[in-house]
A protein has these predicted regions:
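Conserved SAM-binding motif I beta-strand of class I
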Residues: 3-8
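A general structural motif
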Residues: 9-13, 37, 72-80
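S-adenosyl-L-methionine
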Residues: 12-56
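Flexible loop/turn segments at secondary-structure boundaries
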Residues: 13-14, 41-42, 61-65, 101-104, ...
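A structural alpha-helix within SAM-dependent methyltransferase catalytic domains
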Residues: 46, 77-84, 112
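Mobile active-site "lid"/loop adjacent to the S-adenosyl-L-methionine
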Residues: 52-82
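C-terminal catalytic and target-recognition region of SAM-dependent MTase-like enzymes
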Residues: 78, 92, 97-155
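Helix-to-beta-strand junctions that scaffold the AdoMet/dcAdoMet cofactor pocket
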Residues: 87-89
Length: 155
């Protein structure tokens, strides 16, 4: 990509973000690095009619700001709905989570709900979870935490 917009609530992550751009031969000064609650940024982007070809969602399973507590199990549908609104038709949303509180089936239900509530259409391009050599013990289902879904917005 020529330009990215990174939104993170944690100011402490700025040096690491800059380092990652440098490692990937991307000019840091040409990237938008925003320290903000992502829900506030999404509202701003909608107001400014900003649209993105690719939106990557990788929130922590649980996070707290001054005004909001984010829980993946409770708030991921809302996060997806906000992302859908700023993704161009034909664009891709990469939805990921490390939350062990719900299954991949539930995660895909979150996606379905978000698109349905906005009367939008989508297709799942790919999905990933832990590799086969990373065994999850049947008595410790929480070990099956990784879920990544590539979603194409159709309209």
């Amino acid at each position: 990509s020529k330009k990215t917009t990174s939104v993170d609530l944690a100011k402490r992550s700025l040096p690491k973000k800059r380092e990652q751009f440098t490692i990937n031969n991307m000019h840091v000064d040409k990237q938008d690095i925003i320290v903000e609650d992502v829900f506030n940024y999404f509202k701003y982007a909608v107001r400014k009619n900003m649209l993105f070809d690719l939106v990557v969602l990788d929130p922590p399973s649980f996070a707290r700001s001054k005004k909001h507590t984010f829980s993946a199990s409770k708030d991921y549908v809302k996060l997806l709905k906000e992302a859908i609104q700023i993704t161009v038709k034909g664009g891709v949303i990469v939805a990921s989570t490390n939350s062990a509180n719900f299954s991949m089936m539930t995660f895909r239900d979150f996606i379905k709900r978000a698109f349905k509530e906005l009367n939008e259409k989508y297709t799942v391009e790919e999905s990933f979870s832990l590799p086969k050599d990373f065994r999850v013990h049947e008595k410790f289902k929480e070990g099956d935490y990784l879920k990544v879904v590539f979603i194409r917005k159709l309209r």
